Amino acid sequence: MPSHAKSSLEAGLVALKQGNYQTAIAQLEPIASSQSNATASLQAQVGLVMAYARSGEVPKAIAFSQNLIESNNPQVQEWATRALEHLTKRKKPEQESKKVETGFVAFENSTPDSTPDSTPETPTFEEKPNEQVIETKSDDIPPMVPLAKLKATLATPPPPPTAPLSGFMGSVTRTQAKLFGVIYWRQAQRARAWQPLRKPKLIPLRLLSAGTFIALFWVMREILKLAMGFINQTLVKLPYLEPLQLLYRDPTQVLLIALVILIGVSPWLLDLLLANLYGQREFPKDVLNTHSREAVRVLQRCCQQRHWPLPKLRVLPTAAPIILTYGSLPRNARIVVSQGLLEQLADDEIAIIYATQLGHIAHWDFAVMSLLLLVTLPTHKLYQQVSELGDKISAKIWRWPVTILASLIYGVWCLLTGTALWLSRLRLYYSDRVAAEITGNPNALIRALLKIAIGVAADIQKEEETSWQLESLNLLTPVSYQQSLSLGTIASNLSFESFLKWDTANPYRRWFTINNSHPLMGDRIERLCQIARHWHLDTELHFASVPSKVKRQSFLLQIAPWLGIPLGVLFAALVWITWQLAFALKFLNLKWIYEDWSFITGCLLIGFSIGTVMRINSFFPDIKPATVQTDDSLPNLLSDPSALPIDSISVRLVGKLLGRQGTSNSLAQDLIFQSSAGLVKLHHISWLGQSVNHQDLIGRQIIVTGWFRRGATPWIDIQTLETQSGKTIHSPHPIWSTFLAVAAQAWGAYVFLTG
């Protein structure tokens, strides 16, 4: 686009945002009538619809809407149709004092020569895209990118010149850096009067809360006993030092008493921790009232009904949308919200998110989660500090021990958080239900959850890594940062319904959430839609019934290593029965089996090994150039409801490598691929002896080749990472899988034969 036309377009959009409608009309009309750039013309016409509608010239707004209906782009047609319906029903112009934020949105399938203003026409491989943020206000058109409700869209790099262009205009706040495509919100209504839902059975949640406490206690006890034993063994081997007799004692009783005490004092200790680590501060109710009056009313009404004091309100100065609750009793509960959530959600959405936290308090699961946070937060901080210490050490001979120590601490943190994965998933279903019943607005919760995912992904893209806050507080937040990666960035290329079809239609979907901290987003939203339909409401998302096309054989092959374990038990039983018969017939005396039942362990390892070997070829097929998928195919891969990780789709994608740098990412736990279609998690295994480290490529444009896998969290197993300069990193997933299978086979055979 010529520079003067681009300047006029920008000036017109800025004038529209500021309410200078006549100036906006004067700037946009020449561009709207121009045929030199189709995308800019559509952009200007959308702006003119809003400008004419806001200035009271409804007939002209209708005329431009009718022109837009004839567009070849279906999204433009849908928007223009809704705008025309609104304008034709309108009897008189509304007062200009009533303002609703809207934004221009991305029109998919634009031709390459119709380049968005914010995108250079010939971006290079390493080039960073320009940024443009546009925000307009209008009251006379249907909501596009969230229209007064969504206050944030994602940041993403522009697609390569050969890819379909998307990323037109979006409703954003000044805190957001870039535009990311179309997000269409139906703004489905809330219930004005509703019947109470059937009371859920809380016994599973209660039992799981108790089980989580027991699991946490057991893991901590074993770690403590291991540490105590290691210290004493070290002291024994050192000269002139004696082991500490205290460390030979059983720590069970002391640890149990300590955990009970920690639950009681957790609110005050977490106040100190969050204030010192993340800058948490008090959040006056009056300030919350400026963001969401309904949230204050919900808190006051619910607490009054249950005879609770109002929870203490806190705020975190972070741009990522976060909310969590901690405490030991309803009277000392704290609800912590981030500044980003207050800025990115609408009034009713903030209110229902606060209502979900009241659900955690009502169900008492927040007490166990508070204890978990109190234990894991210092552990995560120690991991962070040791990692930073390792980054300061220049000599490799000293850096390696620190790196190993940081990795061990990270492993301990993962073990501790792993004790609460099941509770973290289940409790969200209960809190969603409570929030919907309190407010009568399940559709607002659907929008809120999706916008939180969008905001979290935007924060990761802006920071180009996963922040410490997102990682350490993940278990207590309503949306996981892992599930936000693809969900929060795919909106311009794929509808939410299409992306979430896997979550609702795949018959084996729940098997892939075992190691996830949060339930499937599509499953949560489908339950909220059921509540909305129960109250005779239209739903924010419409999930069509999709027949299952998943082959059972594919799923069995997917879990072959784990199926090998029960098969190993059957094999052990067969061996034992065979021995009994041989012994009874005085044919053979396998005394080593009779006296030592450890042979069962050997059978389990052998079964696991056989299952792993059976799966390797299907899990890591040869990547052939003729069948490799590129960036354009990523939305289709994400929307396939019948996909399983075993499908192993070969991909070759161009984009940017994101993640933390330094010791804290030595295990490649924070590797994210940013393409024109969104964010995808990467799995990488370091290969000893490589001259190039994966951290050397973070922040650079790369080409990733590997196997795309659709699970609860989509990811890519890396085969190679390449740069424009020719540097290549190999990730030996097949080799390591083979090594694991051989090691398990050898170990199992040794145990089986020797006992």
Predicted segments with their positions:
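Hydrophobic or amphipathic, alpha-helical segments that drive membrane association/targeting
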Residues: 2-34, 42, 56-57, 63-113, ...
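An active-site-proximal "capping" alpha-helix that borders the catalytic cofactor pocket
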Residues: 271, 299-303, 424-445
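Short pre-active-site segment immediately N-terminal to the catalytic Zn-binding motif
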Residues: 287, 339-352
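Active-site-proximal gating segments in proteases and membrane effectors
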Residues: 310, 315-331, 388, 392-396, ...
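Active-site scaffold of zinc-dependent metalloenzymes
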Residues: 323-345
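Active-site recognition of the HExxH zinc-binding catalytic motif
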Residues: 337, 352-360, 364-365, 428-432
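Catalytic Zn2+-binding segment of zinc metalloproteases
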Residues: 358-374, 441-443
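Post-HExxH zinc-binding segment in Zn-dependent metallohydrolases
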Residues: 375-397
